[in-house]
């Protein structure tokens, strides 16, 4: 069926499935493709080894949007990502190119495709207070508070997932509303304005994939992962 909608390509897959290699291969073969990273860690400067970020040489030869976009001392929420990615898609089409969104952050893909609810933006002051409470009371205390304010969210978030607990409490405190109510006022989903071409890399041999993941872990450690984390912790007091 023919469509007049401009195309947007999604390339999804788990860790160590070869997404970057596929994206670069497509760019070489078809041309006029601009790669947009859909990764919650590659977006940060300095998180190079831990995120298995493409090498500087690769990024120079095959530029990736939303890689090294911001620093760890800046908040770059999923809302920021969706807004930036949507703008990038428009700009790429204006250049008569095709956006190829590549990554493994399935939540980001889902929100781009189906629309982002109009949740309140992150509040640095409130976030700092919540982080201070974690230091004093422990994360379990905040998870218990979330259980009172929004049991559904609390049940879906592990008690050790600090970032998601903080965000859920931000939403509860800033809006005074349940996220499901806020979902009614959602942004325009990409699926309604673009022709989405979705491709997935899902290895059938799970054992081999796990071997590749384990091999990557050892390689990253040998490349200096521990030292990178220590350096980031020292620089940003993580």
Please place each PLM-identified region on the residue numbering:
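Phosphate/pyrophosphate-binding catalytic cores of soluble transferases and nucleic-acid-acting enzymes
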Residues: 1-238
């Amino acid at each position: 069926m023919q469509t007049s909608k401009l195309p947007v390509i999604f390339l999804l897959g788990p860790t160590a499935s070869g997404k970057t290699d596929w994206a670069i291969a497509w760019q070489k073969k078809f041309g006029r493709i601009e790669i947009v990273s859909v990764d919650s860690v590659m977006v940060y400067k300095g998180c190079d080894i831990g995120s298995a970020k493409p090498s500087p040489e690769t990024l120079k030869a095959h530029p990736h949007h939303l890689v090294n976009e911001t620093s760890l001392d800046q908040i770059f929420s999923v809302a920021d990502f969706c807004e930036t990615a949507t703008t990038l898609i428009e700009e790429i089409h204006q250049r008569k190119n095709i956006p190829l969104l590549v990554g493994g952050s399935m939540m980001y893909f889902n929100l781009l495709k189906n629309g982002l609810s109009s949740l309140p933006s992150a509040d640095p002051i409130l976030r700092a207070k919540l982080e201070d409470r974690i230091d004093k009371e422990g994360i379990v205390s905040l998870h218990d508070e979330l259980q009172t304010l929004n049991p559904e969210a609390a049940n879906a978030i592990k008690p050790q997932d600090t970032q998601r607990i903080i965000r859920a409490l931000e939403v509860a405190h800033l809006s005074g509303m349940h996220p499901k109510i806020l979902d009614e006022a959602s942004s325009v989903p990409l699926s309604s304005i673009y022709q989405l071409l979705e491709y997935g890399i899902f290895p059938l041999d799970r054992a081999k994939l796990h071997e590749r993941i384990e091999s990557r872990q050892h390689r990253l450690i040998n490349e200096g992962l521990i030292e990178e984390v220590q350096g980031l912790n020292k620089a940003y007091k993580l």
